[in-house]
Regions:
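YjeF_N-associated NAD(P)HX repair module
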Residues: 1-8, 12-13, 17, 115-195
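Positively charged, low-complexity intrinsically disordered leader regions
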Residues: 1-46
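General N-terminal targeting signals
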Residues: 22, 27, 34, 94, ...
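Nucleotide and nucleotide-moiety/phosphate-recognizing core
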Residues: 37-121, 130-152
Length: 197
C-alpha cells in the first residue's frame, strides 16, 4: 500500500529523522541530488546541456547540488536562480557549485541553446500560493519549449497538500523524496508527470 504524506507531515518526519540520527540536512540534500541526476540521465544524453532552475529554499539547494553532480559527471550545467539562497544548506551547495566553475545567473528570456533537459528546483511542497511574475513567465517558457523537465520533489506551482494548481511546471518526471506527497495524487497532480519515489 502506498503511503502518502502532507507537506507538514514530511517536514516533521524529516526533522525527526535528523534529530534522531544526527544526519545533517546537507547529506539529505546530496542524496536528493543524486536521485535527480539519475532522472536527468533518463532524459538527456551524457555530457549534454541541462538547465537547472533553483529557488531560494532547500528545493533550490537540491538543484544546486544536482547541477554540481551533473557538471562533475562531464555534463554542461546552466543554472538560473530566482533570488539568493535563503538556507544554509542551499548557500553551501551554491558555493560548491561555483567551485566547479558554474556561475548561477538570473532567469533569461530564452532557454539556453542546445538544452536537452530542464530541472525544476524552484519551490517544494511548502508553496501554497500561485506562481506569479517572473516565475509564471518561466513556467510558460519551459512548458512551451518541448524540452523534457524533471521536477524536484513536486512540480513548482502544484499545491503539495491539495493538488491545486493555476500556473505550474509540467514535468516529464517528478522525483519525490522519501514518500509520495498527497498533492501529487489529488487535483491536477496526477496529470502533471510520471513520479519516482
Amino acid at each position: 500500500m502506498l503511503t502518502t504524506l502532507t507537506p507538514a507531515q514530511m517536514k516533521a518526519l524529516e526533522a525527526d529523522f535528523m534529530a534522531q540520527t544526527g544526519v545533517p540536512g546537507s547529506v539529505l540534500m546530496e542524496m536528493a541530488a543524486h536521485a535527480v541526476v539519475e532522472a536527468v540521465a533518463r532524459h538527456a544524453p551524457s555530457g549534454s546541456r541541462v538547465l537547472f532552475l533553483c529557488g531560494p529554499g532547500n528545493n533550490g539547494g537540491d538543484g544546486y547540488a544536482a547541477a554540481r553532480l551533473w557538471r562533475m559527471a562531464g555534463g554542461d550545467a546552466v543554472v538560473w536562480e530566482l533570488g539568493e539562497p535563503a538556507t544554509p544548506d542551499a548557500r553551501m551547495n551554491r558555493t560548491l557549485l561555483t567551485l566547479q566553475g558554474v556561475t548561477p545567473m538570473s532567469a533569461q528570456e530564452r532557454l539556453p541553446e542546445g538544452c536537452a533537459c530542464i530541472v525544476d528546483a524552484l519551490f517544494g511542497t511548502g508553496l501554497t500560493r500561485p506562481l506569479d511574475g517572473a516565475c509564471a513567465r518561466l513556467a510558460a517558457l519551459c512548458n512551451a519549449s518541448g524540452v523534457p523537465l524533471v521536477a524536484t520533489d513536486i512540480p513548482s506551482g502544484l499545491n503539495g497538500a491539495t493538488g491545486a494548481a493555476e500556473t505550474v511546471f509540467h514535468a516529464a518526471e517528478t522525483v519525490t523524496f522519501h514518500r509520495m506527497k498527497i498533492g501529487l495524487l489529488l487535483g491536477q497532480g496526477p496529470a502533471l508527470s510520471l513520479i519516482h519515489i
